[in-house]
Amino acid sequence: NNAAPRYCIETRGQTACSVTLPVSANGLNYELNTEKLTPLYRHHAIKFRTNLSGTSYFFDRQSAYDDAFGRAYLGWQRKDGKQTISVLPFYQAQLAGSSEFDSKKENNRRAAPYMLAHGVGVQLSHMVNPGNATQLYYSLERYRQNYRETDRALRNDGWHDSTYLSLARRFGSTTLFGGWQYNRFVPENKNIRNTVNNAAYHRNGFNIGWIQQWQVLGGLNSRLTASFANRRYKGIMAFGTEPQRNRERSLSINLSHNKLSYKGITPTLNYSYSHIRSNAPYAMRNIHQWSLGGEWNF
């Protein structure tokens, strides 16, 4: 349920302690990506892409914490032997269980529309030197989000901007990569009740990773990724006297084996760890997650 560890805050001479504690559950995580290119002229094409993902805790009767995300793109792409560039307008919808709605009673049966958004993304991929398999990738994205609930919309409706730059190089059966990402959120309402809207933020982060094909182990594939980021909010945080500052760290490990594939489906073993340190006690997080999955390319 993405709740912070138990904490207490001193406010107006009184002590207030959290009542919502972390809850564990077994769930089903799913993801489906589709893409189709329709050639136009020479290197130009119309590109259609969809992404669908989410988590369901239905079988543990914890669907109040379900989430789902869908995005559909339709735009233009140009691709040649060294470079790919695309401009893709998109529309997205986010669904959530009742735990994300302040105005709803607890419901463990279904997720409901929570947030809608529309925007445009630009992606550029460039093969620096095909001979040594070095690739440079750059993306730029901007979208506007609209929340369903009035009170949440007051704080969180607005524009998201992000840019990402990465460099990857392959050394035989080894691939190393690293990247930098910048995000910001600019709320539509800069001030609320004569106070700076503290939902606005800037985030700087970078990641490093290692992909390995272990031929000596008969086809084992591994992927290790670590990321580090600092998020700085504007305005004064709730129950505080200064802006909120977060330090975010994460680590993920993914394993698969070619010989375990069955009819195109490859099982995967995944582990992820995320940790957030913050001067706001309610923003602290420490999450471990194990999952068994199956990847199917068709």
Q: What are these model-derived regions, one by one?
A:
Residues 1, 46-50, 83-89, 133-138, ...:
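Transmembrane beta-strands of outer-membrane beta-barrel proteins
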Residues 1-51, 55-56, 60-62, 71:
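Outer-membrane beta-barrel initiation region
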Residues 2, 36, 52-60, 78-80, ...:
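Transmembrane beta-strands of outer-membrane beta-barrel pores
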Residues 7, 189-191, 195-207, 211-260, ...:
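Outer-membrane beta-barrel transmembrane domain signature
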Residues 30-39, 72-78, 120-126, 163-169, ...:
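Residues on the lipid-exposed face of transmembrane beta-strands in outer-membrane beta-barrel proteins
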Residues 37-44, 79-83, 125-131, 170-174, ...:
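Outer-membrane beta-barrel channels and translocator barrels
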Residues 270, 285-298:
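Outer-membrane beta-barrel "beta-signal"
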